[in-house]
From Swiss-Prot:
GO molecular function, one term: protein serine/threonine kinase activity
Post-translational modification Phosphotyrosine, affected residues: Y882, Y919, Y974, Y981
The protein's name in its UniProt record: Probable leucine-rich repeat receptor-like protein kinase At5g63930
Regions of this protein lying in the Extracellular compartment: 27-737
Residue stretches of each LRR repeat: 72-96, 97-120, 122-144, 145-170, 172-192, 193-216, 217-241, 243-264, 265-288, 289-312, 314-336, 337-360, 361-383, 385-408, 409-432, 433-456, 458-480, 481-504, 505-528, 529-552, 554-576, 577-602, 604-624, 625-649, 651-672, 674-700
Signal peptide: 1-26
A Pfam family reported for this protein in Swiss-Prot or TrEMBL: Pkinase
Length: 1102
């Protein structure tokens, strides 16, 4: 009460001063109020410099409009929009009692909205949007009974919408989106009979959508997306006959979709996606004759697709994907003549694809992938002239691909992989030279690759592995400068690999394994400066290994095994500093093993068995401290002693030296190789005692007459070398569900080769060519948006960020700068402006490989994955448009000294991130791997829900002298020891990196620390457990650890983290198993039986 009286006194004193001043100057009272208002502003651009106290009236001042009364004009309008003003809004605004319009939008004003605004009783339009106002909406706003437009979006306003809003009976527009408004929606909103637009998205509004909303009888636009609204959708929404737009996506609505919504006969857009809606799709939706956009994806909808949906004669886009819909695709969908987009992927649909869909002449994007569809592909698809993207992968489709597919349509993306298709590849797929991604892998296709494909100038990815294709390597293919991936493995190709392969200058992946290629490997392959993976294994190639191949300095994976290569291995192999895997096994290579192999510090696997190598094992191999998966030198003709330097390979899991002519003793220091899971020294000429190795088996030492000690005959006076008895607990003692899952994972995983990464496109894409300044279409700009976002322009982004002003920067990274942009339509985006390295020349066109990557990323949708809304290229600026995450990154919050994340939030983040990764690994088809999991790439929304971000981004950032860089290896501290360039290794690398993030959440430590503080967090945790056992001392001291249940739960999650960071990728669980273990750990709340700590640390430590 005292504070209120003091504020009142200050107001009256200010009023008295103004009156006193007005007595000594000629300026009228409202002019004095305006000068007081100006005094609280910071006018950086001096836009208000003509506000002069010497004037008698303020009517000529910038932004001021008065009535026409000549004697004593009244201020009716104050419009200071976009004047670059900062500071605060003075309470003196309440003195402008005749004001009808107040527009302070697009400035930098802060502070609270003064309650004195309620004195402006004539106010009709109040626009305060795009500022930094905070605090609550003053309840006095309810006194503005003449108010028609209340526009306050894109501020920092908090609190709830006041009940007094219901007093604004003249209100037509209530626009409050992109603030921090919380609480429930007031039921008094039902009083607003004249309200036409209610937009309050991107806030934190909770509770239900009140049934009183049915009283807003004039409502046209209802936008409450991205809040925390829950409960069922009220059936009263059906009372809103004028409703045109219902935008309620990304909330927590549950229950059924009310059939009463079909009474909204003016409805044009219904966006209910990313909620928790269940039950069938109401057949009554078919009565919405004006409906154009229907988005119900990512809910829990079940049942069949109503045939009545076919009555939506004006529909343009329908997306029912990512639900649990069953039954057949209704043939009535073929009645929607204007349909451009139909997405039904990731459901449980059965039956055949209706031939009626081929009558949809305007169809441009069709995705029916990840279902259980059978039968043939309708022949009529080949006549759809507007077809841009066709994805039917992961079904059970059979028959042939329509032979004239591509003749009439301008195909950009075609993915029919993982089906049972047979016959030949159509010749016309790239007839119009726009094909970017062609994936027909894992089918039963036969015949040759058509010339029309091998000469396709726009082609970026050609994926035809695992078919029955024949013929020779298409030499024409390498005349196309954009090709980055050629996958022809597991077919029946014959003949030589042509010299023209050296012309594929952008090639990053060349996979030709398991064919019948013969002849020598062409030396021209050394011209492929961007090549990261070369797999020519299991062919019939002969001749020497050309030294030119070692000019491919970007090589990370080189697999030449199972051929007939001969001669020596050139020493230039030691110059491949990026190499992580080298497989040369089962050839006829001879000579000595090059000592230069010791330079390959990133090597994780070295396979050279089954050759004719002679001489000694180079001691330089002991420098390969990153070697982790295997060192295989078996079945050669090696002589001399085993160099003790190999004991430096502390991460090594498999050491195979059998079937050589090695002599001397097995170095006793091999007992320190605690990571060894398997080894074989058999059939050599070794002597002396066997070191204290783990998992000792007699078969690993037989064929060496001079060896002794367990498991062979005892050595004379070798008691010190006798191994200690195992104290491990029987497996039957561990009955925890988590451990059962873990055992199933470890026991069930086998080493296998997995196909290289294929790109997935499943989200709606709208491509709009921007206009040049003269109004003519420009070929130098490209905007790609992923609906249902509205089609904004590059100019909108410039305006929203004040031409990318520093004040809008919210982050910086190696890839570029991130800006916060609030667009006129109400969307808040994180705009990543990529660092450009094009120098000189006209290089504004977006290359096809870049577009393909962008489209791939934009097509991924999951609640725990940051959404890429689009890409914009304009006059040399490359912009990525992301979903905005207001809480920033996990790394920033977690490693801030003031971090107050409790365990419940941390576990929620851990589980959310795991679910996002599991979606990429297991539910996308083909599977997608992140490659750079770290705490800074896990972003948090207002509810601390985890969103995995930046996956795949490094592949689309232009690097100097290259069209697209090779896949990155991750970030320091998160990189799995065995990381290589294939899907198999990358998948396990993701899991390792995720395990590091778990350890960060548990310990609070950064992934890498100074050596004196324990070095990397993985080794620090392992060392701590070995020294002090599994106890709460390893956990973040900032957490409250008095609750034994919480500590027990955290230690259970710690075990999961240790499994994820196992040295052996074979021992790591899959992401799907990680999610199951985390869920089970929460259910049990730490009550599970525990793993034996000693065994756990032994099986996971290097």
């Amino acid at each position: 009460m005292v504070k209120e009286m003091m504020k009142l006194a200050v107001f009256f004193i200010s009023l008295l001063l103004i009156l006193l001043i007005s007595e000594t100057t000629g300026l009228n009272l409202e002019g004095q109020y305006l000068l007081e208002i100006k005094s609280k502003f910071v006018d950086a651009k001096q836009n208000l410099r003509n506000w002069n106290s010497n004037d008698s009236v303020p009517c000529g001042w910038t932004g001021v409009m008065c009535s026409n009364y000549s004697s004593d004009p009244e201020v009716l309008s104050l419009n200071l929009s976009s004047m670059v003003l900062s500071g605060k809004l003075s309470p003196s605004i309440g003195g402008l009692v005749h004001l009808k319009q107040l527009d302070l939008s697009y400035n930098g004003l802060s502070g609270k909205i003064p309650k004195e605004i309620g004195n402006c009783s004539s106010l009709e339009i109040l626009k305060l949007n795009n500022n930094q106002f905070d605090g609550e909406i003053p309840v006095e706003i309810g006194k503005l009974v003449s108010l028609e437009n209340l526009i306050i979006y894109n501020n920092r306003i908090s609190g709830s919408l006041p009940v007094e809003i219901g007093n604004l009976l003249s209100l037509s527009q209530l626009v409050t989106y992109s603030n921090n408004i919380s609480g429930q929606l007031p039921r008094s909103i039902g009083n607003l009979k004249r309200l036409t637009s209610f937009r309050a998205g991107q806030n934190m509004i909770s509770g239900s959508l009140p049934s009183e909303i049915g009283g807003c009888e004039s409502l046209v636009m209802l936008g409450l997306a991205q809040n925390q609204l829950s409960g069922e959708l009220p059936k009263e929404i059906g009372m809103l006959k004028k409703l045109s737009q219902v935008i309620l996506w990304e909330n927590e609505f549950s229950g059924f979709i009310p059939r009463e919504i079909s009474n909204c006969t003016s409805l044009e857009t219904l966006a209910l996606y990313k909620n928790q809606l269940v039950g069938p799709i109401p057949k009554e939706l078919g009565d919405l004759q004006s409906l154009e956009f229907l988005y119900l994806y990512r809910n829990g909808l079940n049942g069949t697709i109503p045939r009545e949906i076919g009555n939506l004669s004006y529909a343009i886009e329908i997306d029912f994907s990512e639900n649990a819909l069953t039954g057949e695709i209704p043939l009535e969908l073929g009645n929607i003549e204007g349909l451009e987009l139909l997405y039904l992927f990731e459901n449980q649909l059965t039956g055949t694809i209706p031939v009626e869909l081929s009558t949809l002449k305007n169809l441009s994007k069709l995705d029916l992938s990840i279902n259980a569809l059978t039968g043939p592909i309708p022949l009529g698809f080949q006549y759809l002239r507007g077809l841009f993207m066709l994805q039917l992968f992961q079904n059970s489709l059979s028959g042939t691909i329509p032979p004239k597919l591509g003749w009439y349509s301008d195909l950009w993306v075609l993915d029919m992989s993982d089906n049972h298709l047979s016959g030949r590849i159509p010749s016309y797929l790239c007839l119009h030279s726009n094909m970017i991604i062609l994936n027909l892998g894992t089918n039963n296709l036969s015949g040759n690759i058509p010339t029309g494909i091998t000469t396709c100038k726009t082609l970026v990815q050609l994926r035809l592995a695992r078919n029955n294709l024949v013929g020779r390597f298409p030499s024409n293919l390498c005349k196309q400068v954009n090709v980055t991936a050629i996958e022809l493995g597991q077919n029946r190709f014959r003949g030589s690999i042509p010299r023209e392969v050296g012309n594929c200058s952008a090639l990053q992946r060349l996979q030709l394994a398991d064919n019948g290629f013969t002849g020598e490997l062409p030396r021209e392959i050394g011209m492929l400066s961007q090549l990261g993976t070369l797999n020519i294994s299991s062919n019939k190639l002969t001749g020497e290994v050309p030294s030119e191949i070692f000019n491919c300095k970007m090589l990370q994976r080189l697999d030449m095994c199972c051929n007939n290569f001969s001669g020596t291995l050139p020493s230039e192999v030691g110059s491949l500093y990026q190499l992580e895997l080298l497989k040369l096994s089962n050839n006829n290579l001879s000579g000595t093993i090059p000592v230069a192999l010791g330079n390959l510090s990133r090597l994780t696997e070295l396979q050279m068995g089954g050759n004719l190598f002679n001489g000694s094992i180079p001691r330089e191999l002991g420098s390969l401290t990153g070697l982790q998966i295997a060192l295989n030198l078996s079945y050669n003709k090696l002589t001399g002693e085993i160099p003790p330097e190999l004991s430096n390979l502390v991460m090594l899991e498999f050491l195979l030296l059998n079937n050589n002519n090695l002599s001397g003793e097995i170095p006793s220091s091999f007992a320190n190789l605690s990571s060894l899971l398997g080894y074989n020294f058999s059939y050599n000429s070794l002597t002396g005692p066997i070191p204290l190795l783990r998992n000792i088996s007699m078969s690993s030492f037989i064929g060496n007459e001079g060896l002794c000690g367990p498991p062979l005959n005892q050595c004379i006076q070798t008691q010190p070398f006798a191994p200690s008895q195992s104290t491990g607990k029987p497996g039957g003692m561990r009955s925890s569900k988590i451990i059962a899952i873990t055992a199933a994972v470890i026991g069930g995983v086998s080493l296998m080769l997995i196909a290289l990464i294929v790109y997935l496109m499943r989200r709606p894409v709208r491509t709009v060519a921007s206009s040049a300044q003269d109004g003519q279409p420009s070929e130098m700009s490209l905007d790609i948006y992923f609906p249902p976002k509205e089609g904004f322009t590059f100019q909108d982004l410039v305006a929203a960020t004040d031409n990318f002003d520093e004040s809008f920067v919210v982050g910086r990274g190696a890839c570029g700068t991130v800006y916060k942009a609030v667009l006129p339509a109400g969307y808040t985006l994180a705009v990543k402006k990529l660092a450009s390295n094009h120098e000189g020349g006209n290089n504004n066109n977006v290359d096809n490989s870049f577009r393909a990557e962008i489209l791939t990323l934009g097509n991924i949708r999951h609640r725990n994955i940051v959404k890429l809304h689009g890409f914009c290229n304009h006059q040399g600026s490359n912009l990525l448009l992301y979903e905005y995450m207001p809480k920033g990154s996990l790394g920033e919050i977690l490693h801030d000294p003031s971090c107050n994340l409790d365990w419940s939030k941390r576990f929620k983040i851990a589980l959310g991130a795991a679910q996002g990764l599991a979606y990429l690994h297991h539910d996308c088809k083909p599977r997608i791997f992140h490659r750079d999991i770290k705490s800074n790439n896990i972003l948090l929304d207002d509810k601390f829900e985890a969103h995995v971000g930046d996956f795949g981004l490094a592949k689309v950032i232009d690097m100097p002298h290259s069209k697209s860089m090779s896949a990155i290896a991750g970030s320091y501290g998160y990189i799995a020891p065995e990381y290589a360039y294939t899907m198999k290794v990358t998948e396990k690398s993701d899991i390792y990196s995720y395990g590091v993030v778990l350890l960060e959440l548990l310990t609070g430590k950064a992934p890498v620390q100074p050596i004196d503080q324990g070095g990397d967090v993985v080794n620090w945790v392992r060392s701590y457990i070995r020294r002090d056992a599994l106890s709460s001392g390893v956990l973040d001291a900032r957490l409250t650890l008095e609750d034994e249940r919480i500590v027990s739960h955290m230690l259970t999650v710690l075990k999961i983290a240790l499994l994820c960071t196992s040295v052996s990728p074979v021992a790591r669980p899959s992401m799907r198993q990680v999610v199951l273990m985390l869920i089970e750990s929460e259910r049990s709340e730490g009550e599970q039986e525990h793993l034996d700590t000693e065994e756990l640390t032994q099986t996971t430590t290097p």
